[in-house]
Amino acid sequence: VGDHHVTGSPYYQNTPMLGRLLAEWGDADVGALYLLPLWQPVLLAEQIATLASIAEGRFIMQCGLGRGDDQFSALGQNIRFRPSAFEESLKCLRQMWRGETVSSKGRFHFSAATISPIPPEPIDVWIGANATVAIERAARMGDAWLAEPSLTVEQAKTAFNTYRQARERLGLSMPDTIAIRRDIHVSERPNEADMVQRQINQTGYRGFSMDALTIGDPDQVASEFRALYEIGYTDIIIRSLHPDQGHTIASLQRLAKVKDLLK
């Protein structure tokens, strides 16, 4: 579940949506994305600790700097201070989740904050990063790194090597999880994939290169996923490209074939 604010179209906020989903979720891993510079750390620590206490399985906080002047201005934050606000927030979050009393006089100002409940087990922190300095921050501060969906396979290989080298310089082994998101459509036939690709190319897609999008039949999608696994990525998170719900559901159903091909 993502984190967007002051959007032009309806966007249902991540914390209440995830709280509802957890009623049906079971014990599988679960999590959400939070843009740390936009959130008051005590409020966010409480929200995530509550979700983690409800969840039956591991809770993952994906996090990043965020972008877009509109949402920073609307929430009273200075976009120029994103890196320092991110690092300060993450440090405070981890302290509060351990049950510590925390004060801050940096980008955020609060005194003697404690939260309850505290998470029943440690929160996994996956840091989304694309620029070299951000990938190095993810290597230093995160339990895992989440590569952005705008990368082509070749760019994903370069970014992976940047992350690996940063971990080596820090004297750290590679984590169990190195994830990447792909925006995809799994078609029934190659000609359907060509049609979807033409439609997306005509309208543009978030400024991404078309080579960064995963569009194809199950064999084609499995081939790209296999290339990412061979680079060293352990987890692929998908977002559906097609705007039509029926096509999206059909694409998700075809992912079962992709999974079989990767065994």
Language model features: what each stretch is:
Residues 1-263:
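Active-site-adjacent structural elements that line small-molecule/cofactor binding pockets in enzymes
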